[in-house]
Each structure stands twice: as structure tokens, then as C-alpha cells.
């Protein structure tokens, strides 16, 4: 019988107090209030760890690299305690026939109750011969494992959209998972790679509430993909003020002005980069001085240079510059001063007339 998360933690010598603290941090990482703490604790105490099978198709393994760097919760807690990661040919010790035997065993034992996580995508051209796993095309393995899965998580832009291996003319016919598997609930977690805490947060939510998170129209978790990077960017005030970097390493760049004119795709990209950030919340690309390339959006790889300026953005500040806005402000201030002076003159004249009238 599979142990519960709490049983594993107790076996590791973790106290009840530390367990509740962990549940509190988990609620915070998911954007949930303190009222959810008892519900999370109960789920961790009573629900068995969920078996997860993690497959790899055409990809660069950047999603796995991101995942193992999660800090809230730690990847080791997710892998060793929260879930039962029974198959992942990148992280598991077993290999070859032994690894494939484990896959078959878990699929049989937990039929209909395991989560399938997919990193990368299947190529369909030439019967899928561009990606071979265990001696057979990855497309065959994907369909075989997916048929009895409880739900599917598409890790990264490769599995979610196709990504760079699907770039025109796409000779291998690399195809996102949802276009191959159409009869299962699929949670897309795009990004190249996704943020580590977003990945572990999705898993934590599914284990805690025993359901998939609320998704947007594109199948992404709303808790992490409901806002544009631009909406919470710390450079947003410069955007609204029309203060833009015009050349790399110019004075505006050194002052941390908006990178919109340098091709930043933040205004059209939905992700949690500007709030959750990367490397335990240390930074994100825009904070490091480079514009967002929109890596979590469908088709970003075929939309031209990363340094091409976005067009069609009609918000205040996009076409304005500091001089224009400064000039406008001067006109407004000048008009206000003139109006104030006129009002003061009228008031003085009125008082003078009142004084003259009283003398007579």
C-alpha cells in the first residue's frame, strides 16, 4: 500500500509542527488563504502519494532542470514524499529493460489512478521514427501510457505548443500533446522552461484537492497564467511614463527603463515571471536586463526576432516618450497656473469692490 505524505514525513523524523509549517507554506505558494491550511493538512495526512509517470519526447530536458531547482516546495519533497515518481528515464536509477518493466508494473497496478507528465512532444513524420524510446517510436509509448492515465500534465512549451522543434518548416512534424491525446484532461504548463515553483505548485494543487486546477481557455492553470508579465513588472511605471531603453547600455538602460522598444514581449505574455520569479525568487529576465521573449506563448518561435518591437499595443505610454509626456505635463501645469492666477485676480478684484462699497 502506498504511504501518505504525512507518513513519509514522520518516518523521516519530521515533527508535527514542521509538517503544519510546510502545509502553511504550501498554501502560500498556491496563493491560498490561511483558511485552506486544515484542508491541505488533512489531504496530506490521509491521501496516498499519487503515482506519476514522467515521459520524455523531443525536448532538451530544461523542464526537468527547472523542476529539480524548486524551492517552495523543494523538488526532493515532491519526488520523495508528495508523489511517487515511479518512472522518469532521466531521474530514475534503473535503465533499459529494467526501467521499462517498472513502467509496465506501475501502469498495471495503478490503472486509471496515475498522473502522466509529458516533457517534450512526439514527432509524427515517418511514423514517429525521429524519436525512439525503448525501441519504439515515442508516439506509440505516449498513446500507450496515456490510455489509463487519470490526467496528463504537459510540461513546457514543447509539450504544450510544439516549441522550437515545431518551427517552420517542421520537418519531423513535431506535435503538441493535446493534438495527439484528445480523450484525457490535459493541464498545460508552458514556458521554456516553466518556472520551478509553478511546476511543483500544479502538482501540489492536484494532490491536495484531488482535482485539476481551474484552467483558462488554452488549458493553462489560471493561478499562474492569468496575468501578463507586463501587469506586475517592476518596470511598468517607466512604460506608463514613456521612458524606454533605445539602445543596449544607453543611459536609459542603466536607469532601468522599460525594455518595450528593445522587443520585450511582456505586454502579450501570460506567466508568473514578474511575481514568482526564478532561482528561489531571485530574479527574472527583465530584471536581468533583457526583454521577455514570450517563451510561454504559442508560436513564439516563429514570430520573428526576439528584438522586434511589438506593434498594435495601444496603451498609454507606448508611442509616447519622456519629452512628449513632459511637454504635455508642462502644458497642463501651465494651464493650471494660469487658471489659478486668473481666479486669484478675480478674487482680489471682488474683495476690492466690496471694500470700496463699504467705504461709500
From Swiss-Prot:
Its cofactor is [4Fe-4S] cluster; [3Fe-4S] cluster. SUPFAM superfamilies: HydA/Nqo6-like. Residues 1-43 form the signal peptide. One of its GO terms (cellular component) is [Ni-Fe] hydrogenase complex. GO terms for molecular function: 3 iron, 4 sulfur cluster binding; 4 iron, 4 sulfur cluster binding; electron transfer activity; ferredoxin hydrogenase activity; hydrogenase (acceptor) activity; metal ion binding. Its main location: membrane. Keywords: 3Fe-4S, 4Fe-4S, Cell membrane, Iron, Iron-sulfur, Membrane, Metal-binding, Oxidoreductase, Plasmid, Signal. Belongs to the [NiFe]/[NiFeSe] hydrogenase small subunit family. This is Uptake hydrogenase small subunit. It comes from Cupriavidus necator (strain ATCC 17699 / DSM 428 / KCTC 22496 / NCIMB 10442 / H16 / Stanier 337) (Ralstonia eutropha). The lineage of its organism: Bacteria, Pseudomonadati, Pseudomonadota, Betaproteobacteria, Burkholderiales. The gene is hoxK.
Amino acid at each position: 500500500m502506498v504511504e501518505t505524505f504525512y507518513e513519509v514525513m514522520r518516518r523521516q523524523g519530521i515533527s508535527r509542527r514542521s509538517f503544519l509549517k510546510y502545509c502553511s507554506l504550501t498554501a502560500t505558494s498556491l496563493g491560498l488563504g490561511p483558511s485552506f491550511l486544515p484542508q491541505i493538512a488533512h489531504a496530506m495526512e490521509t491521501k496516498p502519494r499519487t503515482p506519476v509517470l514522467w515521459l520524455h519526447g523531443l525536448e532538451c530536458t530544461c523542464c526537468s532542470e527547472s523542476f529539480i531547482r524548486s524551492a517552495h516546495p523543494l523538488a526532493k519533497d515532491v519526488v520523495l514524499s508528495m508523489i511517487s515518481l515511479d518512472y522518469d528515464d532521466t531521474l530514475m536509477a534503473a535503465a533499459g529493460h529494467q526501467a521499462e518493466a517498472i513502467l509496465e508494473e506501475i501502469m498495471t497496478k495503478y490503472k486509471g489512478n496515475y498522473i502522466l507528465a509529458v516533457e517534450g512532444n512526439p514527432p509524427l513524420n515517418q511514423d514517429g521514427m525521429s524519436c525512439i524510446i525503448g525501441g519504439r517510436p515515442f508516439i506509440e509509448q505516449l498513446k500507450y501510457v496515456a490510455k489509463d492515465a487519470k490526467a496528463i500534465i504537459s510540461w513546457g512549451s514543447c509539450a504544450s505548443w510544439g516549441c522550437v522543434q515545431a518551427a517552420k518548416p517542421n520537418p519531423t512534424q513535431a506535435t503538441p500533446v493535446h493534438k495527439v491525446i484528445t480523450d484525457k484532461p490535459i493541464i498545460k504548463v508552458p514556458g521554456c522552461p516553466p518556472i520551478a515553483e509553478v511546476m511543483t505548485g500544479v502538482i501540489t494543487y492536484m494532490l491536495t484537492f484531488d482535482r485539476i486546477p481551474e484552467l483558462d481557455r488554452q488549458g493553462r492553470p489560471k493561478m499562474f497564467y492569468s496575468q501578463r508579465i507586463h501587469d506586475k513588472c517592476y518596470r511598468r511605471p517607466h512604460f506608463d511614463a514613456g521612458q524606454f531603453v533605445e539602445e543596449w547600455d544607453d543611459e536609459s538602460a542603466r536607469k532601468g527603463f522599460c525594455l518595450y522598444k528593445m522587443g520585450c514581449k511582456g505586454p502579450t505574455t501570460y506567466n508568473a515571471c514578474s511575481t514568482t520569479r526564478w532561482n528561489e525568487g531571485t530574479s527574472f529576465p527583465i530584471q536581468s536586463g533583457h526583454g521577455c521573449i514570450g517563451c510561454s506563448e504559442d508560436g513564439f518561435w516563429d514570430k520573428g526576432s526576439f528584438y522586434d518591437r511589438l506593434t498594435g499595443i495601444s496603451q498609454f505610454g507606448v508611442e509616447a516618450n519622456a519629452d512628449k509626456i513632459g511637454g504635455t505635463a508642462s502644458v497642463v501645469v501651465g494651464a493650471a497656473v494660469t487658471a489659478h492666477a486668473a481666479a486669484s485676480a478675480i478674487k482680489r478684484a471682488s474683495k476690492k469692490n466690496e471694500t470700496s462699497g463699504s467705504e461709500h
